[in-house]
Regions:
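Hydrophobic beta-strand positions
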Residues: 90-92, 105, 150-151
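Extracytoplasmic/periplasmic sensor domains and loops in membrane signaling proteins
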Residues: 71-85, 102-141
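N-terminal secretory signal peptides that target proteins for export/translocation
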Residues: 1-8
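Short N-terminal helix-loop-first-beta-strand/juxtamembrane motif that initiates sensory/input modules
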Residues: 33, 38-51, 77-98, 134-136
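Conserved beta-strands of PAS-like sensory domains
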Residues: 64-69, 143-168
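Extracellular/periplasmic ligand-binding regions of membrane signal-transduction receptors
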Residues: 28-70, 105-109
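Bacterial N-terminal signal peptides
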Residues: 11-21
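Sec/Tat signal peptide C-region and signal peptidase I cleavage site
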Residues: 21-27
Length: 168
């Protein structure tokens, strides 16, 4: 009987410890994470494109939120990583492509993937039509549970895309 009581006590202690160190319920919820990224960006100001700036060795339109240029600025995406243990990216629309201008997604060489393009996949199709995409996706060779949202200027024109991903 003592063994059973000890086992029950240890099981309860283990379960309590797990609950104490568990992440918040929304920590791995892609829709909650993308909502947080979008709220952080909106708090800065309205999105708009103004001029150009090199990212990852290529020219791209400069995406601003309010007066803050997002190209090569990693404060917001790094804050999302810290809060949600998620990858985050802001893309700018460049013609028919979406170019990473701010990201914590790393290339195989270990560098931020700025200057790379959103693949022409189901996420691309959805955001190009102004729709959200949430689901499994490959990002620079790694599988993620991800969400993508179109970023629209005050006139409703798509000027970019926000992305978050939780590694599978």
């Amino acid at each position: 009987m003592k063994t059973r009581a000890a086992t029950t006590t240890l099981t309860t202690l283990f379960a309590t410890t797990l609950l104490a160190v568990a992440l918040p319920a929304h920590a791995y919820d892609p829709k909650a994470t993308i909502a947080d990224l979008d709220a952080r960006l909106a708090k800065i100001g309205a999105p708009h494109v103004e001029g150009a700036e090199a990212v990852g060795g290529r020219a791209a339109p400069a995406l601003l939120f309010g007066e803050r240029k997002i190209n090569n600025n990693f404060d917001v995406v790094d804050a999302v990583r810290k809060a949600h243990n998620a990858t985050a990216t802001v893309f700018v629309k460049d013609g028919e492509e979406f170019v990473r201008v701010s990201t914590n997604v790393l290339t195989p060489e270990g560098k931020r993937g700025v200057g790379t393009q959103l693949a022409r996949n189901k996420a691309y199709e959805a955001v190009s039509k102004g729709q959200q995409f949430c689901g499994e996706i490959d990002v620079l060779g790694t599988q993620f549970d991800a969400c993508y949202n179109p970023i629209k200027d005050v006139g409703g024109k798509i000027v970019g895309v926000s992305y978050i991903g939780h590694k599978k």
